[in-house]
């Protein structure tokens, strides 16, 4: 695996991870089963939350598939005995592909599902912290965006404290981008116009 750490091997792996991350499962499933363009529905975001506005069942499938994108890539690297920091970097690339897919002029989802896949595959403690935080915040406020934001922040802090620098820096960078993608949600919450999921 030492050879894999060289740039010759790492660059194509990161490129492949980006392409896997950029697969727009939400857009594909909504288009195939409902003949609708998800970009013209609700917030226009091609993610699981917006797919929920079309059909709850399809949104759950989208969530699982988007999580699986990260899980698949990281499990392959784990089989190749990759260092944890490389797993975080590759997971980061999957999330970038999800958020900035080349197929839609780099306008994609907000990165929550593939981020969940990253921590599920690498650090189960961060995964449970993320899920529990999301569930508690959602039960109180009913805002998916607020739940995601607080979950990202709490998991980011925990990762920074418990992981080494080389690993945590990639998760922190990934978290910052995911938070930036939620800036419109923050503005709507401040203005009182953010819609609750249900």
UniProtKB/Swiss-Prot annotation:
Q: Which family does it belong to?
A: Belongs to the PlsY family.
Q: In which domain of life is the source organism classified?
A: Bacteria
Which residues are listed as membrane-spanning? 10-30, 57-77, 86-106, 118-138, 160-180
Q: Which reaction does it catalyse?
A: an acyl phosphate + sn-glycerol 3-phosphate = a 1-acyl-sn-glycero-3-phosphate + phosphate
What species was this sequence derived from? Anaplasma marginale (strain Florida)
Q: How does it assemble?
A: Probably interacts with PlsX.
Q: What class of enzyme is it?
A: transferase
**Protein name as catalogued:** Glycerol-3-phosphate acyltransferase
Q: Which GO terms describe its molecular function?
A: acyl-phosphate glycerol-3-phosphate acyltransferase activity
Instruction: Give the function comment from the record.
Output: Catalyzes the transfer of an acyl group from acyl-phosphate (acyl-PO(4)) to glycerol-3-phosphate (G3P) to form lysophosphatidic acid (LPA). This enzyme utilizes acyl-phosphate as fatty acyl donor, but not acyl-CoA or acyl-ACP.
The UniProt record lists the EC number as: 2.3.1.275
Q: How does it sit in the membrane?
A: Multi-pass membrane protein
What gene is it encoded by? plsY
What is the protein's major site of localization?
Answer: membrane
One Gene Ontology BP term is: phospholipid biosynthetic process
């Amino acid at each position: 695996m030492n050879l894999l750490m060289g740039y010759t091997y790492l660059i194509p792996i990161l490129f492949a991870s980006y392409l896997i991350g950029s697969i727009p499962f939400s857009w594909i499933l909504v288009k195939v089963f409902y003949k609708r363009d998800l970009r013209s529905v609700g917030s226009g975001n091609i993610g699981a939350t917006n797919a929920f506005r079309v059909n709850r069942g399809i949104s759950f499938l989208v969530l699982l598939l988007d999580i699986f994108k990260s899980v698949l890539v990281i499990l392959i690297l784990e089989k190749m005995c990759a260092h944890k920091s490389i797993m975080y970097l590759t997971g980061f690339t999957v999330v970038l592909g999800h958020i900035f897919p080349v197929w839609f002029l780099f306008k994609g989802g907000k990165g929550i599902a593939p981020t969940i896949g990253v921590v599920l595959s690498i650090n189960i403690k961060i995964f449970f912290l993320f899920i529990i935080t999301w569930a508690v915040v959602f039960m109180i406020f009913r805002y998916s965006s607020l739940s995601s934001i607080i979950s990202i922040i709490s998991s980011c802090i925990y990762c920074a404290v418990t992981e080494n620098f080389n690993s945590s820096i990639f998760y922190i960078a990934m978290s910052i981008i995911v938070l930036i993608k939620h800036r419109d949600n923050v503005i709507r919450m401040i203005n009182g116009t953010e819609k609750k999921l249900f």
